[in-house]
């Protein structure tokens, strides 16, 4: 295990020293389902993949490792990226089965200079979609950091599990302003300076939705 941690640390250090730290992650919510995916640029991707495989094999040797968990390495190669999968059965009585269904599927994609991950039904197909979208976007200038949250899918996801009048009021309001439901946090570096400018933005639809939620809460007897 010490060797595994050392290899992971080496990849992290070499990536930082190369001067390029680049990555992205996205969460997709729909009804009672969730999909998570992302990717990162790394230096020494094969070394990182070998370390991950070794760590998993060590875990499999433990007596309490669940035998029902299915792990497959190098299942296929797509655009130079090797895929590995982990499938975890979920008993129907578990709360997680309401979101992921009968099993949790995790896919990992590794190459010389990148690592991708996906958590979704048909996780490899989902991950291929992320890889294709990343390739089609090409190289372009981006902010050092940007976090964008679309509020409507989040509230609809929550509403699929709990019928809440405040949430329902916010959903109705957001649907009157399509595409204006984002909460954005961004970081911009100042020119010729080491200073950073942080910006927090609420789109028009979000502000109105908050107001609608407050009104629904007051009407329902909630104390704000």
Task: Describe every region a protein language model picked out.
Residues 1-224:
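Signature of soluble extracytoplasmic/periplasmic domains of secreted precursors
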């Amino acid at each position: 295990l010490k060797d595994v941690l050392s290899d992971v640390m080496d990849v992290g250090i070499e990536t930082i020293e190369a001067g390029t730290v680049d990555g992205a992650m996205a969460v997709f919510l729909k009804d009672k389902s969730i999909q998570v995916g992302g990717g990162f640029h790394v230096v020494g991707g094969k070394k990182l993949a070998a370390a991950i495989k070794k760590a998993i094999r060590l875990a499999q040797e433990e007596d309490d490792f669940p035998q029902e968990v299915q792990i497959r390495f190098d299942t296929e190669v797509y655009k130079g990226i090797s895929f590995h999968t982990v499938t975890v059965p979920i008993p129907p009585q578990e709360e997680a089965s309401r979101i992921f269904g009968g099993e949790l599927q995790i896919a990992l994609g590794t190459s010389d200079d990148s690592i991708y991950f996906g958590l979704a039904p048909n996780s490899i197909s989902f991950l291929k979609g992320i890889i294709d979208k990343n390739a089609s976007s090409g190289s372009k200038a981006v902010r050092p950091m940007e976090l964008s949250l679309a509020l409507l899918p989040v509230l609809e996801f929550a509403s699929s599990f709990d019928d809440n009048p405040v949430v329902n009021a916010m959903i109705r309001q957001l649907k009157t302003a399509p595409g204006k439901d984002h909460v954005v946090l961004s970081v911009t570096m100042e020119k010729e300076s080491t200073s950073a400018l942080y910006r927090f933005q609420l789109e028009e639809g979000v502000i109105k939705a908050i107001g609608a939620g407050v009104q629904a809460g007051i009407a329902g007897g909630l104390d704000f």
